[in-house]
């Protein structure tokens, strides 16, 4: 995946670079939505299969699909949300960070909306690979029915290999993602063009009144099929999430020039095929292609679904990194798999979580038809959340009035809530799976955030004010600690309080360095912070300095590199003569404290997953001194 921090439009690299970004966006941004034709119409026709499909049902469903793509993807994402960026970055957490910056962090509705949206995305990242790959491999059943029983095993094998190679990075093969996916969209468009002429009545689906008429006459079945119709736009959130990787204009160009026309042609072709041959409703996508082309199309479909899965996995890694930097998750181990591309990352714990989840889904559901019933809830939930956040964006950032913002987004919100209601009807058929996954992840993030806030309050109340400590320690007396040469850096999250690790060092070692740095690392509610704003140095006394280092939530928090910038500000020290003092906290559960018992247990478990600050902040391991402390929670 090409993953560089682009300007807000993405057209800063010249014509050749722009074309490259467009092709790259096709592979990464549109991989997921490009695999929806494999199963969307098949699932939408399922409620009508018993009585046989009729003309009005086929045309009505295709019309719903066409206009769902038009309203939700084209209008909401391509034309509107791609402009609602946070310094060029998109996605639920990026939008949440921007709103927290404008409105403050203490807005519970915004906070929980962001957590729910992020949690739903992780659930989607488990379902998408399982459903997409199984749907592609099931095309082989048309070549030989004997392959049917091997679909789950083959799907699991592909997933194991895909997740196993994540640690090596995907920079080398990602150059092929765009061209392969372009070929996939062209193949879909060709299949549609070949069959539209099977029954020209399908063109009536281009009239939005056809969709409305179908819903008006479908009764309760109409609400049921909306859940399947929504499968056409699964993956649309990737348009917004990958905004920072490719820029707005390449994503828009890819949609209007290739992706949208190919999807429209394919869905219209599937609809015409079913009108002319109702028996094709069992698998309209693969039945569009002649026998000689079936195997190549299945192979191409499998490659496209693997690429779509890779895009979702990469998105989950990026979301996890943002969640860590924003304080929603503990410090996770994040490996950079490219020396030149900071977007190429690997998060081992998230990778393992996704792999286990995907394999459980494949073994539990067994085929794409069963798993499709579980799909949709996480995606619709994420879209509803993004619309709610977009409403606040219009008000807080663009300054729109309540009435104007409501007029623009209320119709869209109502449509998405209807889709969510339709998908919630599938709770008992497996729809509970993404809900349970999202709930578990949201509880983890909420617990971690609440626990961290409690510990910060605890430290602020119990620790000695830093200015009082410095005044006391700088007074010359017979009890003054021994001064030793060199620099000591003490990490703390509460800069106006004396770090416990500093007090422990004085208590046990009875020494104070010539130069003592109270270091606090901050994460801004913006994706990237320039080096000009990276550091702030405040001289507190002859021997004490306060140093604030600021990163964006998409930056690599490399403290060692940031310290090198201090020399440019006249603050000189040698890294190999500097000792970094870190507090290793040992949480002890006690009754009647700040967290309920169940949250205490979860918080302690999450604390165990956090990596050492020395690793997270890239501190030289041979210069780090850790002192333990017990904290009652």
UniProtKB/Swiss-Prot annotation:
Gene Ontology molecular function terms on file: potassium ion transmembrane transporter activity; symporter activity
Family: Belongs to the HAK/KUP transporter (TC 2.A.72) family.
Subcellular location: Cell inner membrane
Gene name of the record: kup2
Its biological purpose: Transport of potassium into the cell. Likely operates as a K(+):H(+) symporter.
Any single Pfam family the record assigns to this protein: K_trans
Keywords per UniProt: Cell inner membrane, Cell membrane, Ion transport, Membrane, Potassium, Potassium transport, Symport, Transmembrane, Transmembrane helix, Transport
Catalytic activity: K(+)(in) + H(+)(in) = K(+)(out) + H(+)(out)
Listed GO CC annotations: plasma membrane
Membrane topology, from the record: Multi-pass membrane protein
Name of the protein described by the UniProt record: Probable potassium transport system protein Kup 2
Transmembrane region(s): 18-38, 61-81, 107-127, 145-165, 176-196, 211-231, 255-275, 293-313, 345-365, 371-391, 402-422, 427-447
InterPro entries named in the record: K+_transporter, K_trans_C, K_trans_N, Kup
């Amino acid at each position: 995946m090409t993953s560089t921090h682009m300007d807000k439009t993405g057209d800063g690299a010249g014509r050749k670079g722009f074309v490259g970004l467009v092709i790259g966006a096709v592979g990464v941004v549109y991989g997921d939505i490009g695999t929806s034709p494999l199963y969307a119409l098949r699932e939408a026709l399922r409620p009508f299969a018993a009585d046989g499909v009729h003309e009005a049902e086929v045309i009505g469903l295709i019309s719903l699909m066409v206009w769902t793509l038009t309203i939700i993807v084209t209008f909401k994402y391509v034309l509107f949300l791609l402009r609602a960026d946070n310094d060029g970055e998109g996605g639920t957490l990026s939008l949440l960070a921007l709103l927290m910056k404008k409105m403050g962090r203490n807005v519970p509705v915004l906070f929980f909306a962001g957590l729910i949206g992020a949690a739903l995305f992780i659930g989607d990242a488990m379902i998408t690979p399982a459903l997409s790959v199984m749907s592609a491999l099931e095309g082989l059943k048309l070549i030989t029915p004997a392959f049917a029983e091997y679909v789950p095993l083959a799907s699991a094998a592909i997933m194991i290999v895909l997740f196993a190679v994540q640690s090596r990075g995907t920079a080398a093969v990602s150059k092929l993602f765009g061209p392969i996916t372009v070929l996939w969209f062209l193949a879909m468009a060709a299949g549609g063009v070949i069959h539209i002429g099977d029954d020209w009545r399908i063109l009536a689906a281009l009239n939005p009144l056809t969709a409305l008429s179908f819903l008006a006459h479908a009764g309760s079945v109409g609400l049921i099929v909306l859940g399947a119709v929504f499968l056409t736009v699964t993956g649309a959130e990737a348009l917004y999430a990958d905004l920072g990787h490719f820029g707005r204009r390449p994503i828009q160009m890819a949609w209007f020039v290739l992706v949208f026309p190919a999807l429209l042609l394919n869905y219209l072709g599937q609809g015409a095929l079913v009108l002319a041959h109702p028996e094709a409703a069992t698998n309209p996508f693969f039945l569009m292609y002649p026998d000689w082309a079936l195997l190549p199309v299945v192979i191409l479909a499998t490659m496209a679904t693997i690429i779509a899965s890779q895009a979702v996995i990469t998105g989950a890694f990026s979301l996890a990194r943002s969640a860590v930097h924003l304080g929603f998750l503990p410090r996770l181990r994040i490996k950079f798999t490219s020396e030149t591309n900071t977007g190429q990352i690997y998060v081992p714990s998230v990778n393992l979580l996704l792999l286990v989840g995907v394999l459980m889904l494949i073994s539990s559901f067994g085929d794409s038809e069963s798993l499709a019933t579980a799909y949709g809830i996480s995606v619709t939930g994420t879209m509803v959340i993004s619309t709610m956040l977009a409403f606040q964006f219009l008000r807080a950032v663009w300054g729109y009035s309540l009435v104007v913002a409501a007029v623009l987004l209320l119709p869209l919100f109502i449509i998405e809530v209807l889709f969510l209601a339709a998908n919630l009807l599938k709770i008992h058929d497996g729809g509970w799976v993404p809900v349970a996954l999202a709930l578990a992840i949201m509880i983890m993030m909420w617990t971690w955030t609440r626990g961290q806030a409690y510990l910060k309050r605890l430290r602020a109340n119990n620790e000695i004010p830093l200015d009082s400590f410095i005044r006391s320690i700088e007074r010359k007396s017979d009890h003054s600690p021994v001064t030793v040469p060199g620099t000591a850096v003490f990490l703390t999250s509460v800069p106006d309080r004396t770090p416990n690790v500093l007090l422990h060092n004085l208590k046990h070692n009875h020494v104070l360095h010539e130069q003592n740095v109270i270091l606090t690392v901050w994460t801004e509610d913006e994706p990237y912070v320039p080096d000009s704003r990276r550091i702030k140095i405040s001289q507190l006394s002859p021997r004490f300095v306060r140093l604030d280092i600021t990163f964006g939530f998409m930056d690599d928090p490399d403290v060692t590199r940031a310290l090198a910038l201090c020399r440019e500000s006249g603050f000189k020290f040698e890294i190999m003569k500097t000792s970094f003092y870190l507090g290793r906290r040992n949480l002890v559960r006690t009754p009647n404290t700040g967290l309920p018992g169940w949250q205490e247990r979860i918080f302690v478990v999450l604390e165990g997953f956090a990596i050492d600050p020395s690793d997270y902040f890239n501190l030289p391991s041979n210069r780090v001194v850790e002192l333990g402390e017990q904290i009652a929670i």
